[in-house]
Design a protein with these regions (language model features):
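Arg/Gly-rich low-complexity intrinsically disordered repeat tracts
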Residues: 7-17
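Long, acidic, intrinsically disordered low-complexity segments
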Residues: 19-42, 131, 138-139
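Structural motif
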Residues: 40-49, 67-76
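Amphipathic alpha-helical interaction segments
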Residues: 44, 60-63, 83-84, 88-96, ...
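Short, hydrophobic/amphipathic alpha-helical patches that form generic packing surfaces
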Residues: 50-62, 76-87
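Amphipathic protein-protein interaction modules
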Residues: 68-118
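Helix-rich interaction surfaces within compact, conserved domain-sized segments
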Residues: 108-138
């Protein structure tokens, strides 16, 4: 079991795009994700996208430790981005290294315009990721 009470690993299923949701529905779901992470961390303030990515990276790594280094935090966020973008086939999971860290390979070029579009895409995928965690918890 991990920090979110979910068994690791999750199965990969194809991600439905945000365009199937109204903007207000997406904003509500993103707020739910932020509250889930805030509660898991026992913080008072809502986390930003970077903290959400960090927590997804830890979830995918499968273990928690106190005092992550700056480099480890960057690696965890990279793991999260790879995991989220694997829903659309941009990355493919290739396995774990000798220390148990997941590794991915880029399978296709990501064509996004600007930081805003990148952040929106990651938020959409994070919403989907947490919906999958919920579904796994309930099954």
């Amino acid at each position: 079991m991990d920090n979110f009470g979910i068994n690791y690993p999750l199965s990969t299923i194809h991600y439905p795009l945000k365009r199937n949701m109204e903007d207000w529905e997406f904003e509500f779901e993103w707020l739910r994700v932020r509250h889930t992470v805030k509660d898991a961390l026992k913080h008072d303030a809502l986390p930003d996208l970077n903290v959400v990515l960090l927590m997804i990276g830890i979830q995918e790594l499968g273990f928690w430790k106190k005092g992550w280094t700056k480099e480890e935090k960057q690696d965890l966020m990279h793991i999260a981005v790879c995991r989220l973008l694997s829903y659309d086939g941009y990355y493919e999971f290739v396995g774990l290294d000798t220390e148990g860290w997941p590794h991915y390979t880029l399978t296709q070029k990501i064509m996004l315009k600007g930081q805003g579009e990148q952040e929106q895409m990651l938020k959409e995928k994070a919403v989907y990721y947490f919906k999958q965690l919920e579904a796994e918890r309930e099954s």
